[in-house]
Amino acid sequence: MHLCHAITNISHRNSDWSREVQASLYSLMSLIILATLVGNLIVIISISHFKQLHTPTNWLLHSMAIVDFLLGCLIMPCSMVRTVERCWYFGEILCKVHTSTDIMLSSASIFHLAFISIDRYCAVCDPLRYKAKINISTILVMILVSWSLPAVYAFGMIFLELNLKGVEELYRSQVSDLGGCSPFFSKVSGVLAFMTSFYIPGSVMLFVYYRIYFIAKGQARSINRTNVQVGLEGKSQAPQSKETKAAKTLGIMVGVFLVCWCPFFLCTVLDPFLGYVIPPSLNDALYWFGYLNSALNPMVYAFFYPWFRRALKMVLLGKIFQKDSSRSKLFL
Protein backbone atom coordinates (compact mmCIF):
# COMPACT_ATOMS: atom_id res chain seq x y z
CA MET A 1 0.00 0.00 0.00
CA HIS A 2 1.20 3.50 -0.85
CA LEU A 3 0.39 6.52 1.28
CA CYS A 4 -1.82 8.79 -0.82
CA HIS A 5 -0.61 11.96 0.90
CA ALA A 6 2.96 11.09 -0.10
CA ILE A 7 2.27 10.51 -3.82
CA THR A 8 2.54 13.78 -5.72
CA ASN A 9 0.89 12.63 -8.94
CA ILE A 10 -2.39 11.82 -7.19
CA SER A 11 -2.32 14.56 -4.59
CA HIS A 12 -5.31 16.16 -6.30
CA ARG A 13 -7.45 13.51 -4.57
CA ASN A 14 -7.23 15.49 -1.36
CA SER A 15 -8.41 18.76 -2.95
CA ASP A 16 -11.54 17.52 -4.74
CA TRP A 17 -13.66 19.07 -1.99
CA SER A 18 -13.36 22.64 -0.79
CA ARG A 19 -12.49 23.37 2.83
CA GLU A 20 -16.09 24.44 3.42
CA VAL A 21 -17.42 21.10 2.17
CA GLN A 22 -14.84 19.19 4.21
CA ALA A 23 -15.77 21.18 7.33
CA SER A 24 -19.46 20.44 6.74
CA LEU A 25 -18.77 16.72 6.30
CA TYR A 26 -16.63 16.62 9.44
CA SER A 27 -19.41 18.36 11.39
CA LEU A 28 -22.14 16.04 10.10
CA MET A 29 -20.15 12.86 10.71
CA SER A 30 -19.05 14.07 14.15
CA LEU A 31 -22.72 14.51 15.07
CA ILE A 32 -23.47 10.95 13.93
CA ILE A 33 -20.53 9.66 15.98
CA LEU A 34 -21.58 11.68 19.04
CA ALA A 35 -25.19 10.48 18.79
CA THR A 36 -24.00 6.89 18.43
CA LEU A 37 -21.71 7.10 21.46
CA VAL A 38 -24.05 9.00 23.80
CA GLY A 39 -27.23 7.12 22.90
CA ASN A 40 -25.77 3.64 23.18
CA LEU A 41 -23.77 4.50 26.30
CA ILE A 42 -26.99 5.55 28.02
CA VAL A 43 -28.59 2.22 27.03
CA ILE A 44 -25.57 0.34 28.41
CA ILE A 45 -25.57 2.30 31.69
CA SER A 46 -29.35 2.04 32.14
CA ILE A 47 -29.60 -1.72 31.65
CA SER A 48 -26.45 -2.34 33.72
CA HIS A 49 -27.54 -0.10 36.60
CA PHE A 50 -31.28 -0.60 37.07
CA LYS A 51 -32.17 -4.03 38.44
CA GLN A 52 -35.68 -3.82 37.02
CA LEU A 53 -34.12 -3.91 33.54
CA HIS A 54 -32.15 -7.11 34.21
CA THR A 55 -34.26 -9.28 31.92
CA PRO A 56 -33.05 -11.72 29.24
CA THR A 57 -34.38 -9.56 26.40
CA ASN A 58 -32.73 -6.42 27.76
CA TRP A 59 -29.36 -8.17 28.00
CA LEU A 60 -29.66 -8.79 24.26
CA LEU A 61 -30.36 -5.06 23.78
CA HIS A 62 -27.42 -4.34 26.10
CA SER A 63 -25.09 -6.44 23.96
CA MET A 64 -26.27 -4.75 20.77
CA ALA A 65 -25.70 -1.33 22.36
CA ILE A 66 -22.11 -2.38 23.16
CA VAL A 67 -21.61 -3.37 19.50
CA ASP A 68 -22.97 -0.04 18.27
CA PHE A 69 -20.95 1.89 20.87
CA LEU A 70 -17.73 0.17 19.76
CA LEU A 71 -18.61 0.95 16.16
CA GLY A 72 -18.88 4.63 17.05
CA CYS A 73 -15.77 4.58 19.21
CA LEU A 74 -13.32 2.45 17.22
CA ILE A 75 -14.48 2.57 13.60
CA MET A 76 -16.36 5.75 12.73
CA PRO A 77 -13.59 8.28 13.57
CA CYS A 78 -11.08 6.63 11.20
CA SER A 79 -13.80 6.17 8.59
CA MET A 80 -14.62 9.87 8.89
CA VAL A 81 -11.01 10.87 8.12
CA ARG A 82 -10.87 8.39 5.23
CA THR A 83 -14.14 9.64 3.75
CA VAL A 84 -13.46 13.38 4.03
CA GLU A 85 -9.75 13.33 3.17
CA ARG A 86 -10.21 10.53 0.58
CA CYS A 87 -7.00 9.10 1.95
CA TRP A 88 -5.96 6.43 4.47
CA TYR A 89 -3.18 7.77 6.71
CA PHE A 90 -2.72 4.81 9.05
CA GLY A 91 -0.89 2.09 7.09
CA GLU A 92 -1.74 -1.30 5.62
CA ILE A 93 -1.94 -3.36 8.83
CA LEU A 94 -4.30 -0.90 10.48
CA CYS A 95 -6.31 -0.84 7.25
CA LYS A 96 -6.92 -4.58 7.56
CA VAL A 97 -7.69 -4.29 11.29
CA HIS A 98 -10.08 -1.40 10.64
CA THR A 99 -11.87 -3.10 7.73
CA SER A 100 -12.26 -6.47 9.47
CA THR A 101 -13.43 -4.86 12.74
CA ASP A 102 -15.85 -2.69 10.78
CA ILE A 103 -17.38 -5.68 8.99
CA MET A 104 -17.46 -7.67 12.23
CA LEU A 105 -19.27 -5.00 14.29
CA SER A 106 -21.69 -4.06 11.51
CA SER A 107 -22.58 -7.73 11.00
CA ALA A 108 -22.82 -8.34 14.76
CA SER A 109 -25.33 -5.50 15.08
CA ILE A 110 -27.42 -7.09 12.32
CA PHE A 111 -27.20 -10.53 13.97
CA HIS A 112 -28.42 -9.02 17.25
CA LEU A 113 -31.44 -7.53 15.48
CA ALA A 114 -32.27 -10.93 13.99
CA PHE A 115 -32.14 -12.59 17.41
CA ILE A 116 -34.19 -9.77 18.97
CA SER A 117 -36.87 -10.41 16.35
CA ILE A 118 -36.87 -14.12 17.27
CA ASP A 119 -37.19 -13.18 20.95
CA ARG A 120 -40.20 -10.96 20.21
CA TYR A 121 -41.73 -13.71 18.09
CA CYS A 122 -41.62 -16.10 21.05
CA ALA A 123 -43.01 -13.43 23.41
CA VAL A 124 -45.99 -12.55 21.24
CA CYS A 125 -46.76 -15.88 19.59
CA ASP A 126 -46.08 -18.28 22.47
CA PRO A 127 -46.39 -16.19 25.67
CA LEU A 128 -47.20 -19.12 27.97
CA ARG A 129 -43.92 -20.88 27.22
CA TYR A 130 -41.87 -17.75 26.55
CA LYS A 131 -40.02 -17.67 29.88
CA ALA A 132 -39.19 -21.36 29.59
CA LYS A 133 -37.88 -20.95 26.05
CA ILE A 134 -36.09 -17.60 26.33
CA ASN A 135 -34.07 -17.73 29.54
CA ILE A 136 -30.67 -16.28 30.34
CA SER A 137 -28.88 -19.33 28.91
CA THR A 138 -30.69 -18.95 25.58
CA ILE A 139 -29.82 -15.26 25.46
CA LEU A 140 -26.15 -15.97 26.22
CA VAL A 141 -26.04 -18.39 23.28
CA MET A 142 -27.60 -15.72 21.05
CA ILE A 143 -25.05 -13.15 22.21
CA LEU A 144 -22.15 -15.56 21.73
CA VAL A 145 -23.26 -16.39 18.18
CA SER A 146 -23.84 -12.71 17.38
CA TRP A 147 -20.25 -11.87 18.32
CA SER A 148 -18.29 -14.97 17.32
CA LEU A 149 -19.64 -15.73 13.84
CA PRO A 150 -19.12 -12.18 12.49
CA ALA A 151 -15.64 -12.11 14.06
CA VAL A 152 -14.53 -15.37 12.41
CA TYR A 153 -16.10 -14.36 9.10
CA ALA A 154 -14.71 -10.80 8.99
CA PHE A 155 -11.17 -11.36 10.26
CA GLY A 156 -10.77 -14.61 8.32
CA MET A 157 -11.92 -13.05 5.06
CA ILE A 158 -9.87 -9.83 5.31
CA PHE A 159 -6.59 -11.17 6.73
CA LEU A 160 -6.58 -14.19 4.41
CA GLU A 161 -7.61 -11.82 1.58
CA LEU A 162 -10.39 -14.18 0.51
CA ASN A 163 -12.43 -11.16 -0.59
CA LEU A 164 -9.75 -10.34 -3.20
CA LYS A 165 -9.46 -13.75 -4.88
CA GLY A 166 -9.32 -13.12 -8.61
CA VAL A 167 -9.35 -9.31 -8.34
CA GLU A 168 -6.00 -8.68 -6.63
CA GLU A 169 -4.63 -6.48 -9.43
CA LEU A 170 -7.85 -4.51 -9.67
CA TYR A 171 -7.77 -3.86 -5.92
CA ARG A 172 -4.18 -2.63 -6.10
CA SER A 173 -4.82 -0.30 -9.03
CA GLN A 174 -8.14 1.11 -7.78
CA VAL A 175 -7.63 1.14 -4.01
CA SER A 176 -4.30 0.08 -2.53
CA ASP A 177 -1.90 1.88 -4.89
CA LEU A 178 -3.94 5.06 -4.46
CA GLY A 179 -3.54 4.89 -0.70
CA GLY A 180 -7.17 3.97 -0.10
CA CYS A 181 -8.71 1.64 2.46
CA SER A 182 -12.24 0.45 1.86
CA PRO A 183 -14.05 -2.91 1.71
CA PHE A 184 -13.48 -4.47 -1.72
CA PHE A 185 -15.16 -7.66 -2.92
CA SER A 186 -14.92 -10.06 -5.81
CA LYS A 187 -18.13 -11.47 -7.30
CA VAL A 188 -18.08 -14.51 -5.02
CA SER A 189 -17.14 -12.67 -1.82
CA GLY A 190 -19.63 -9.88 -2.62
CA VAL A 191 -22.47 -12.39 -2.85
CA LEU A 192 -21.23 -14.09 0.34
CA ALA A 193 -21.10 -10.76 2.20
CA PHE A 194 -24.59 -9.87 0.98
CA MET A 195 -26.03 -13.24 2.01
CA THR A 196 -24.23 -13.49 5.37
CA SER A 197 -24.55 -9.95 6.69
CA PHE A 198 -27.79 -8.79 5.10
CA TYR A 199 -30.03 -11.16 3.14
CA ILE A 200 -30.23 -14.11 5.57
CA PRO A 201 -30.66 -12.12 8.82
CA GLY A 202 -32.87 -9.59 7.02
CA SER A 203 -35.09 -12.36 5.68
CA VAL A 204 -35.38 -13.84 9.17
CA MET A 205 -36.47 -10.44 10.53
CA LEU A 206 -39.04 -9.84 7.81
CA PHE A 207 -40.52 -13.35 8.07
CA VAL A 208 -40.70 -13.18 11.87
CA TYR A 209 -42.39 -9.76 11.91
CA TYR A 210 -44.79 -10.85 9.18
CA ARG A 211 -45.82 -13.72 11.46
CA ILE A 212 -45.91 -11.50 14.56
CA TYR A 213 -48.15 -8.92 12.88
CA PHE A 214 -50.86 -11.38 11.89
CA ILE A 215 -50.73 -13.45 15.07
CA ALA A 216 -50.78 -10.40 17.35
CA LYS A 217 -53.62 -8.91 15.31
CA GLY A 218 -55.60 -12.15 15.62
CA GLN A 219 -54.94 -12.35 19.37
CA ALA A 220 -56.10 -8.75 19.84
CA ARG A 221 -59.35 -9.42 17.97
CA SER A 222 -59.93 -12.58 20.00
CA ILE A 223 -59.35 -10.77 23.32
CA ASN A 224 -61.62 -7.87 22.34
CA ARG A 225 -64.35 -10.28 21.23
CA THR A 226 -64.14 -12.19 24.52
CA ASN A 227 -64.20 -9.00 26.61
CA VAL A 228 -67.23 -7.68 24.75
CA GLN A 229 -69.09 -10.95 25.34
CA VAL A 230 -68.46 -10.92 29.11
CA GLY A 231 -68.78 -7.16 29.52
CA LEU A 232 -65.12 -6.53 30.39
CA GLU A 233 -64.12 -4.11 27.67
CA GLY A 234 -60.78 -2.43 28.37
CA LYS A 235 -59.71 -5.06 30.89
CA SER A 236 -57.26 -7.94 30.66
CA GLN A 237 -55.60 -6.32 27.67
CA ALA A 238 -52.48 -4.91 29.36
CA PRO A 239 -50.17 -7.93 29.06
CA GLN A 240 -51.04 -8.49 25.41
CA SER A 241 -50.85 -4.78 24.50
CA LYS A 242 -47.47 -4.57 26.22
CA GLU A 243 -46.01 -7.41 24.15
CA THR A 244 -47.61 -6.12 20.97
CA LYS A 245 -46.18 -2.65 21.54
CA ALA A 246 -42.74 -4.15 22.12
CA ALA A 247 -43.07 -6.12 18.90
CA LYS A 248 -44.09 -2.99 16.97
CA THR A 249 -41.15 -1.07 18.43
CA LEU A 250 -38.65 -3.71 17.44
CA GLY A 251 -40.37 -3.98 14.08
CA ILE A 252 -39.62 -0.30 13.53
CA MET A 253 -36.01 -0.99 14.51
CA VAL A 254 -35.86 -3.67 11.82
CA GLY A 255 -37.43 -1.26 9.31
CA VAL A 256 -34.83 1.37 10.14
CA PHE A 257 -32.11 -1.24 9.68
CA LEU A 258 -33.41 -2.24 6.24
CA VAL A 259 -33.62 1.37 5.07
CA CYS A 260 -30.13 2.19 6.36
CA TRP A 261 -28.24 -0.88 5.14
CA CYS A 262 -30.12 -2.01 2.01
CA PRO A 263 -28.50 0.54 -0.39
CA PHE A 264 -24.96 -0.36 0.68
CA PHE A 265 -25.42 -4.12 0.46
CA LEU A 266 -27.14 -3.87 -2.92
CA CYS A 267 -24.12 -1.93 -4.21
CA THR A 268 -21.78 -4.49 -2.63
CA VAL A 269 -23.37 -7.41 -4.44
CA LEU A 270 -23.98 -5.62 -7.77
CA ASP A 271 -20.77 -3.60 -8.20
CA PRO A 272 -18.46 -6.56 -9.09
CA PHE A 273 -20.94 -7.71 -11.75
CA LEU A 274 -21.15 -4.17 -13.19
CA GLY A 275 -17.37 -3.83 -13.53
CA TYR A 276 -16.82 -1.72 -10.39
CA VAL A 277 -18.53 1.36 -11.82
CA ILE A 278 -19.83 2.69 -8.48
CA PRO A 279 -17.67 5.67 -7.40
CA PRO A 280 -15.79 5.24 -4.08
CA SER A 281 -17.38 8.45 -2.79
CA LEU A 282 -20.89 7.01 -3.31
CA ASN A 283 -19.87 3.75 -1.68
CA ASP A 284 -18.54 5.68 1.31
CA ALA A 285 -21.74 7.72 1.55
CA LEU A 286 -23.85 4.55 1.57
CA TYR A 287 -21.61 3.05 4.27
CA TRP A 288 -22.23 6.13 6.43
CA PHE A 289 -25.94 5.72 5.83
CA GLY A 290 -25.50 2.24 7.30
CA TYR A 291 -23.57 3.64 10.26
CA LEU A 292 -26.55 5.89 10.93
CA ASN A 293 -28.48 2.79 12.01
CA SER A 294 -26.29 2.51 15.12
CA ALA A 295 -27.20 6.07 16.10
CA LEU A 296 -30.93 5.62 15.48
CA ASN A 297 -31.55 2.51 17.60
CA PRO A 298 -31.38 4.36 20.97
CA MET A 299 -33.67 7.05 19.54
CA VAL A 300 -36.25 4.34 18.84
CA TYR A 301 -36.00 3.29 22.50
CA ALA A 302 -36.43 6.92 23.64
CA PHE A 303 -39.50 7.42 21.46
CA PHE A 304 -41.33 4.17 22.25
CA TYR A 305 -40.09 2.97 25.66
CA PRO A 306 -41.21 5.01 28.71
CA TRP A 307 -38.67 3.11 30.87
CA PHE A 308 -35.85 4.39 28.67
CA ARG A 309 -37.01 8.00 29.00
CA ARG A 310 -37.14 7.66 32.80
CA ALA A 311 -33.73 6.00 32.89
CA LEU A 312 -32.34 8.70 30.58
CA LYS A 313 -33.61 11.41 32.91
CA MET A 314 -32.03 9.76 35.96
CA VAL A 315 -28.71 9.25 34.17
CA LEU A 316 -28.53 12.85 32.91
CA LEU A 317 -29.47 14.27 36.33
CA GLY A 318 -26.88 12.10 38.07
CA LYS A 319 -29.50 10.32 40.18
CA ILE A 320 -27.88 6.95 39.47
CA PHE A 321 -25.21 7.90 42.03
CA GLN A 322 -27.80 8.09 44.81
CA LYS A 323 -28.17 5.24 47.28
CA ASP A 324 -30.50 2.44 46.14
CA SER A 325 -31.07 4.18 42.79
CA SER A 326 -30.56 0.81 41.10
CA ARG A 327 -33.86 -0.32 42.64
CA SER A 328 -35.83 2.58 41.17
CA LYS A 329 -39.15 1.70 39.55
CA LEU A 330 -39.01 2.45 35.84
CA PHE A 331 -42.26 0.66 34.98
CA LEU A 332 -45.30 2.48 36.36
From Swiss-Prot:
Intracellular G-protein coupled receptor for trace amines, which recognizes endogenous amine-containing metabolites such as beta-phenylethylamine (beta-PEA), 3-iodothyronamine (T1AM), isoamylamine (IAA), cadaverine (CAD), cyclohexylamine (CHA), p-tyramine (p-TYR), trimethylamine (TMA), octopamine and tryptamine. Also functions as a receptor for various drugs and psychoactive substances, such as amphetamine and methamphetamine. Unresponsive to classical biogenic amines, such as epinephrine and histamine and only partially activated by dopamine and serotonin. Disruption phenotype: Enhanced sensitivity to the psychomotor-stimulating effect of amphetamine, characterized by greater locomotor stimulating effects and higher levels of striatal dopamine release. Mice display more addictive tendencies. Keywords: Cell membrane, Disulfide bond, Endoplasmic reticulum, G-protein coupled receptor, Glycoprotein, Membrane, Receptor, Transducer, Transmembrane, Transmembrane helix. Signal peptide: none annotated. The gene is Taar1. SUPFAM superfamilies: Family A G protein-coupled receptor-like (SSF81321). The keyword DNA-binding does not apply. It is found in: Endomembrane system; Endoplasmic reticulum membrane; Cell membrane. Widely distributed throughout the brain. Strongly expressed in the mitral cell layer of the olfactory bulb, piriform cortex, the arcuate, motor, and mesencephalic trigeminal nuclei, lateral reticular and hypoglossal nuclei, cerebellar Purkinje cells, and ventral horn of the spinal cord. Moderately expressed in the frontal, entorhinal, and agranular cortices, the ventral pallidum, thalamus, hippocampus, several hypothalamic nuclei, ambiguus, dorsal raphe, and gigantocellular reticular nuclei. Weakly expressed in the septum, basal ganglia, amygdala, myelencephalon, and spinal cord dorsal horn. InterPro entries: GPCR_Rhodpsn, GPCR_Rhodpsn_7TM, TAAR, TAAR1, TAAR_fam. Changing residue 265 to A: Reduced activation of G(q)/G(11) and G(s) G alpha proteins in response to agonist-binding. GO terms for molecular function: G protein-coupled amine receptor activity; trace-amine receptor activity. This is Trace amine-associated receptor 1. Residues 174-185 are annotated as: Extracellular Loop 2 (ECL2). Its main location: membrane.
